[in-house]
């Protein structure tokens, strides 16, 4: 028995020592850089939100956190930010995600202060086909959301993208990606709106 | 002394020409195809690989006399994974945009076979100086090919290099070049070119 243990350590002492040393190295690096990594993430979200709500918004505060249901039993953590300008609420922004064509799509969606109208969305992360699906980030597709009602949106294949209403015209050749964005916004917007009304953070009028 | 200098020279030349990773060894092909849609991500990827290659070569070279043959691959992977994690954290902290573009391909350097090949072939058999030189030259050789491939693809798919417009405005971008098919076609043509050039030399 003792011999077996001795043999084990003879063979593997280097591995044990090295694992410990390398583990320590990673822990130190991670401790040194993780604040910066967190800061980068917040900065990125803040930049996107500012772009979506400018010039109305001056600052953002994290107001609520919510687990949004993606599919049965699958949840994603959502941060809801309140945009303030001149001491008044100028709107809300939240992150949303869901399945895209090739990979998941992560969005930041901005709405006005009563959750009546969407003010816009932007991609935090996406991996759609270059030249086709990745045009969800560009006008005219993206611009259709600015001013659209914050309710159930519907994707149509034929229509005028200039008309701002609940009908979103798909990018030709990228129906799946177009549908994915609509689904993600529909899914999280409706759940978040309900949550906000329940909490009394926005009026029940909408 | 002369013998030592010869070994150094041989090591450097091996990485840059005679055993240049993509053309001669045919190693590290996955990132070659995946991150060469534009020059900036390709260069970032190349520099990360150079860092990991040099660091893991140093680590392996230092412990080469202690290695047990049946545990060596485990030790190589351990060292490589550590330095890849550090490189990944570094990019996330200081180059967040590039980190977002490269996505999972930075952690995937762990399974990049050039690095484990150099640990096995060179670092576990040679001293510190040769290992460092080998890491640098193999990494540089790989990065040069990567950037070359990426500049061809970026030029044809967007008309830009490093994000700067170089093609005339009348140029119609070839979207296919930024997709996987463009990577395969360009790489295939480059390999053919490399082989025909190599043949003439010998």
Task: Tell me the role of every PLM-derived stretch.
Chain A
Residues 2-206:
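Flexible, solvent-exposed loop/hinge segments and secondary-structure transition points
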